[in-house]
Amino acid sequence: MTPGKFITLEGGEGVGKSTNVDFVVSRLRARGLKVVATREPGGTAFGEAVREIFLRQDTVRPEAELLLLFAARVHHLREVIEPALRRGDWVVCDRFTDASYAYQGAGRGIAPGVIDFLRDWIQAGLRPDLTLLLDAPVDTGLKRAHQRSGPDRLEREDSAFFARVREGYLALARAEPGRIRVIDADRPLALVQTAIATQVDSLLAGHV
């Protein structure tokens, strides 16, 4: 059986990841593909428990953040992502390991080598086939996020933190342009989704 493909959507707060996960899933299903939609932290009972701690606990040290996320990622990979890919399903995930580099690495100051070690140990070479990095100015994203709901623990960080996160993401995209495609999310949704559709269709055609 041909393994499925793994698509991730990344970006800072308020860039539209959840909306566009739904869009990507719908586009793939319209092609007759079996698709698993999931998120990080989350995707499993363990992961959702970590998500609650991660977003609601008043204080979580950077090292604890990183280790919690990778603990949740172990369950997510073994219970959801890897079995789906082996079945030939496609997986669409709202955030994955790139978020650890952007938030805990660039944002919190944890050395990339520490994250490299955890990634290589836990993922054993598994990488997304395509990552859609939704990018918007920090102020725009935070305004959208705060309009959506009350701020969670992460969203209460200052704009300097999110500027570091954004630059961390863009640095990843510069380092891996073949996998990570930057999508300008500071424009009408229809235009954002046209750009996303182009990248997804390219993967479907085997060109990514």
From Swiss-Prot:
GO terms for biological process: dTDP biosynthetic process; dTTP biosynthetic process; dUDP biosynthetic process. The keyword ATP-binding applies. It comes from the Bacteria. One of its GO terms (cellular component) is cytosol. Pfam families: Thymidylate_kin. Keywords: ATP-binding, Kinase, Nucleotide biosynthesis, Nucleotide-binding, Transferase. Belongs to the thymidylate kinase family. NCBIfam families: DTMP_kinase. This is Thymidylate kinase. The gene is tmk.
